[in-house]
Amino acid sequence: FIQYLAPLIPHAVKAISDLI
């Protein structure tokens, strides 16, 4: 599960920092 989630974390962080 984590191995699928891990690549998404930087993508999510980038998207969130884009919003802010």
From Swiss-Prot:
GO terms for cellular component: extracellular region. Expressed by the skin dorsal glands. The modification Isoleucine amide is found at residue 20. Its main location: secreted. The keyword Chaperone does not apply. It is found in: Secreted. Keywords: Amidation, Secreted. Has no antimicrobial activities against bacteria (E.coli and S.aureus) nor against the fungus C.albicans. This is Kassinatuerin-2. It comes from Kassina senegalensis (Senegal running frog).
